[in-house]
């Protein structure tokens, strides 16, 4: 993969420095302020990664390159919000992105950088990331403080409440939260660790869509339901706005609890997509009956008719000490249809530990270590083994094994809300193929909020 031209590197460094400078001079409300009627915040993140060359018995159209490669992403985002009336909040997020992926973003299920979903090339791209309304209806049960954060204004709400979010946002803004493994800009970088890899949630190729989400908070329980638009074509950028016909539904139940004085949460999630998708058995039949077709992306030849795709998952976060917590995610999808909007996994499992630097006198530092495993359904395995090419993966053959990940990171706070992270990832059986790899990835991340 070509290196980034010097001029682009200089421009990117200058923009990042400007953002970091703003972190020191931009007006920010005091942390102890109890109410905000408006908010203006931002973030800037640069992630650089490198992988050495690795061994493989063979390579195909959508294989991870065996050569040494570099990858990077840069994002800068504005978070603007205002309260137009009681209980109402309107948010607008513009964002600029640029970057370059390993092997044109192919050859893995668990990609190594969560920011890669947003970039579309080495030229800066400006777009509207989010534009949504959040309305809170207070229902009693006592009051609690909401802290100021990105897309969140400080204020008091009832413990029992109904919250409606409508507009342009991400499924992951509302569902599948986790205190220890959620944000690739500050925590684990790999896709396996900031959501379920098998959660094929409806969104455009950047991870956003239009729709609604309703949340009912009652004591230690939360029930959420949402419907979102998906892409016109699987993993495409243009959205299909026929939300009554093609959509992704999510239902999540959350229970908060404590073991002694150590808090924890369990979330159970069910999702269901309806869209025009290819069935893997149909695609395999096409490939076997048309051996002369040079295009082995057979899924595109049978992408007719509406299909239902669904899955179930459980998400756990648990503090185990004052400065330590653990997380677990497990999900199983039906695995009959092609990937709709996320990555190539039909079952996924991830677990890890997060450590707060307060344990060693560095209260704003964080460290984490995690293991993950992704798996494929028999239908998808057979398709790939016969030489079929999917959206992200396809080696031309398949000696199937689960794709395994080990990730460890350390995030060092270097000034105010500026952090520098080092990250290492080891992937065994990339794209589920025991004939390729293993692969090592080394990364660094610079992140600022202002």
For the regions a protein language model found, what residue spans apply to each?
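Residue-level signature of outer-membrane beta-barrel architecture
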Residues: 33, 82-84, 94, 135-137, ...
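Surface-exposed coil loops of outer-membrane beta-barrel proteins
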Residues: 106-123, 127, 142-248, 252, ...
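Hydrophobic, lipid-facing positions within transmembrane beta-strands of outer-membrane proteins
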Residues: 38, 72-78, 127-131, 162, ...
């Amino acid at each position: 993969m070509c290196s980034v031209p010097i001029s682009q590197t200089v421009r990117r460094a200058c923009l990042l420095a400007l953002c970091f400078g703003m972190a020191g001079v931009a007006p920010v409300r005091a942390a102890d302020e109890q109410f905000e009627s408006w908010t203006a915040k931002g973030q800037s993140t640069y992630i650089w990664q490198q992988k050495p060359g690795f061994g493989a018995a063979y390579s195909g159209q959508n294989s991870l390159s065996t050569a040494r490669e570099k990858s990077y992403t840069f994002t800068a985002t504005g978070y603007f919000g205002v309260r137009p009336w009681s209980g109402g909040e309107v948010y607008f997020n513009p964002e600029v992105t640029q970057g370059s992926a390993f092997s044109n973003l192919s050859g893995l299920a668990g990609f190594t950088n969560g920011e890669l979903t947003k970039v579309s090339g080495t030229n800066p791209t400006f777009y509207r990331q989010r534009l949504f309304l959040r309305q809170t209806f207070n229902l009693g049960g006592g009051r609690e403080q909401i802290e100021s954060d990105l897309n969140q204004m400080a204020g008091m709400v009832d413990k029992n409440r109904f919250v409606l979010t409508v507009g342009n946002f991400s499924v992951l803004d509302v569902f599948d939260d986790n205190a220890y493994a959620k944000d690739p800009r500050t925590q684990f970088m790999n896709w396996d660790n900031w959501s379920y890899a098998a959660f094929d949630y409806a969104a455009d190729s950047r991870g956003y869509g239009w729709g609604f989400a309703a949340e009912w908070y009652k004591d230690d329980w939360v029930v959420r339901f949402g419907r979102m638009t998906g892409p016109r074509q699987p993993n495409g950028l243009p959205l299909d706005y026929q939300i009554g016909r093609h959509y992704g539904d999510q239902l999540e139940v959350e229970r908060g609890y404590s073991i002694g004085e150590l808090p924890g949460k369990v979330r159970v999630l069910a999702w269901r997509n309806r869209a025009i998708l290819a069935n893997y058995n149909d695609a395999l039949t096409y490939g076997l009956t048309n051996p002369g077709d040079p295009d082995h992306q057979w899924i595109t030849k049978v992408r007719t008719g509406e299909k239902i795709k669904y899955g179930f998952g459980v998400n756990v976060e648990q503090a185990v000490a004052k400065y330590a917590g653990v997380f677990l995610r497990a999900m199983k999808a039906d695995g009959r249809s092609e990937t709709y909007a996320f990555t190539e996994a039909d079952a996924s499992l991830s677990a890890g530990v997060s450590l707060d630097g307060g344990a060693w006198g560095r209260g704003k530092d964080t460290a984490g270590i995690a293991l993950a495993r992704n798996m494929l359904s028999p239908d998808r395995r057979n398709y790939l083994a016969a030489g079929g090419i999917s959206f992200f993966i396809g080696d031309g053959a398949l000696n199937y094994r689960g794709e395994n990940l080990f990730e460890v990171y350390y995030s060092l706070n270097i000034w105010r809300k500026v952090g520098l992270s080092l990250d290492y990832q080891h992937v065994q059986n990339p794209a589920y193929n025991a004939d390729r790899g293993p692969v090592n990835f080394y990364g660094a991340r610079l992140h600022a909020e202002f």
